[in-house]
Every structure is written in structure tokens, then in C-alpha cells.
Amino acid sequence: MKTKPLPTAPMAWAESAVETTTGPRELAGHAPLRRVLRPPIARRDGPVLLGDRAPRRTASTMWLLGIDPAESSPGTRATRDDTEQAVDKILRGARRAGGLTVPGAPRYHLTRQVTLTDLCQPNAERAGALLLALRHPTDLPHLARHRAPPGRQTERLAEAWGQLLEASALGSGRAESGCARAGLVSFNFLVAACAAAYDARDAAEAVRAHITTNYGGTRAGARLDRFSECLRAMVHTHVFPHEVMRFFGGLVSWVTQDELASVTAVCSGPQEATHTGHPGRPRSAVTIPACAFVDLDAELCLGGPGAAFLYLVFTYRQCRDQELCCVYVVKSQLPPRGLEAALERLFGRLRITNTIHGAEDMTPPPPNRNVDFPLAVLAASSQSPRCSASQVTNPQFVDRLYRWQPDLRGRPTARTCTYAAFAELGVMPDDSPRCLHRTERFGAVGVPVVILEGVVWRPGGWRACA
């Protein structure tokens, strides 16, 4: 009996799973079958085909780029080269991502916010100015009622903010919540409001003159005075300014319209990495008023050449009817864990003043109400429960001991002794950080400033010093 030979077509199909020698015309007719028998990432090995055969391609590379040769028509595949397809694919991806990434370029992050121009007027500032974000003012009276010591006037803070809003651009028509929205505060405006607390009085008054002259309107001076009263009321009610303000970024560009401004700032990374859009000043260095800049290493004769940290520091004086707030940018080689001891040495007088006078004007507890721990009475009485050293860890014996619950009203606490608070802003990574002291012209007013070059923003959290 004669046997029929096996069909050869399945063998041809099986070979196509290993060898990729099928021409364009044959491949076009069996595209679905080809996807089943040969995965897209299979390599195509073998000699280069001649004639009307398609050029060999590396399927793994095409798969990584997201290109499937079977999805394109034979005419397109014959006219376009693999390299051209790959370049087009890369360019399309880069265009969707927003641009090509240059290897080794510094990474930075931009942030943007629309704010009122009452406390931050970008047209009067320059690129590189420091900006702070302020918590919504409606939260402050509630915080005052929870944090103010007994006897303090909590309504003082609400009245101060109400008077500030009356002098603002939207004072005649407040928001539906009864207060303006949260916004930004320029560091220069904050320094001008605290001008009376700085030792360099002439430089601080120059900053105040710049704000009152260039912020526009006749109510700029009134806003400064009322904002200064708000800061004093915050210290009085223990709603410290550092608890309602945070670092926003270094000013880069802005767009203003009427009493609103859209502000763009660098919140992380090098300040000078982005373009400002101004031909005269394409890059922005950090600019700080000279009265609010402290070189801590030079003040305390510490350290030598090397990289330095930048800190934002608030200082407070808690004395009845003499509350003061001050803000600084401190440069030091000390890390955050070692800065508190240096600030204690620099602002030691404030620390002593707050420890002595911070508890004034507070309602004391009633007399003879658990003022002192009755150790002598308990020791003399044989009826008082006792516990040996071996029974301290046993709740059965510890719970029987006398419980002393003193009334701490009128006594010094950590908040009454708080004299400063600091947060890390960033670093100056150069071995010899450049701090240029000069006088900059803001309109018709000359202001002594310090220009910090090479600042890399790296903001951190707040730490209170008491």
C-alpha cells in the first residue's frame, strides 16, 4: 500500500516561527497567523535577503520602541527605513513629555499660585525674591481660642485681621467666608512690617520705604502697620507666625491684572536653573534684605570654607504689651541638629526675657490648690499607700499611689518660653558660597541687599526653640 506524503505547509509555518525570511507580500497575507506563531520580541537571525525581500530587523528593539512591523502596510514599510521610524517614535514621545531631557541638567520644580497683591506685589519685586505662603486668615481666630493661655485676649487677633482687611484691595467686599482667601506674603513685606525690631534700623527703614513707595496706592503704609499689629497679636495669643507660614519658593516670573497676580516660583532645586523670561536678567539669584540676613558662622566665629545651609528663622519677644516678631535668613555650616544651640547663643537675651516675662498677664490658679507636691505629708502618714521598688512595674500597686494633678495655669511652659523657630530652606553647595552685599535700586529707593548665588532649595519642617 502506498502512503501519501505529509503536507509541507505546516512545516513551512513552523519554520516561520524561527526564521523571519517571509517577504512583505507573503507577510501581509498571514499577519494574524504570524502573530500567533512568532512572538513580537523574537529575534530574526540569518543572512541578509536580496531582491524583493524586506531588510532584516531586530524585533526586540522594535518592541521596546513600541513599533510592530506587521501593523504597517507593505508600501509604507518599503519606503520608510527602520531608523526613521525609531526617530519619529522617540520624537513623538519627547513631544508628549514636554521636551527632551538634557543629561546632567539640574532638576527643579516650579509652583504657581494666584494671589492678591496686598501682601505680595510682584511688579515691585525682582526675580529671586523669597515668597511665603500664608494660611487662610479665617483659621487664625479658631487657633487663638485653643492655644492662648488663660487670661489672654483672644479677640485681639480677630480684630487685627479685620482691620487689615479693611485696608486691603478687597476690603469693601470681603469673601463670603468673611475674610480674604489664603495667599502669598513677600519676604520684603514681612521684613518691612517688622522693621522696628531689627538692629540695623536704617536698612530696615529702607525696606519699609521701598514697600510704601513701590507697592502702589495710598493704603500700602496702612497695610504695613496693621499687618505688624497682626504679628504682635499672633505672638500675644501664641499663634506664632511660623505655624501659619511656610516657604513657597523663589520668585521667577509673574503675570498681574488689577489686584491679582499669577506667580511662578522655584520651590525645589536650583534657583538659577530656570529662565526668568526677562532679557536683562535671564537668571535669578536669591535676594535678601541686608537687615534680615545673618551669617551665623561669622557672628560666632565658627567654621571655615565649605558648603553652607540656609535657614528661615523667626524670633519672638513675649513681654506684656511689648510683643515683637522678627524674621531672618541665616547662613551657616551647622546642620539642623546643631543650629538650636547656636541660636540660643545668638538670641540668648530673648530666651531669658521670654522665660521671665512669658507667663505675665495670665490667669493664675486659685491659691492653695495643689501648688506643691505633698511629699512631706505623704511620708509622715502611715496610712498613705506605698510601693516598693520591685513593685513599680506592677499596675496593681502603682494605681494605689497618690496622684498629683497640679494646675499649670500661670506657670512657664514651652510655648511661653519660645523665643525662636527655624526651618531649613536649602543649601549653597559651593566650597566658597558667594554672598554679595550691595545696594539695589527699587524705583527711587535704594535698599541694601545680600545676593546669594548658587542656592539650591530644599525646604524642611519647623522646629521651635524654647
From Swiss-Prot:
InterPro entries: Herpes_1 (IPR004999). One of its GO terms (biological process) is viral capsid assembly. Disulfide bonds: none annotated. Residues 1-29 are annotated as: Disordered. Interacts with TRX2, MCP and capsid vertex component 2/CVC2. Structural component of the T=16 icosahedral capsid. The capsid is composed of pentamers and hexamers of major capsid protein/MCP, which are linked together by heterotrimers called triplexes. These triplexes are formed by a single molecule of triplex protein 1/TRX1 and two copies of triplex protein 2/TRX2. Additionally, TRX1 is required for efficient transport of TRX2 to the nucleus, which is the site of capsid assembly. This is Triplex capsid protein 1. It comes from Human herpesvirus 2 (strain G). The lineage of its organism: Viruses, Duplodnaviria, Heunggongvirae, Peploviricota, Herviviricetes.
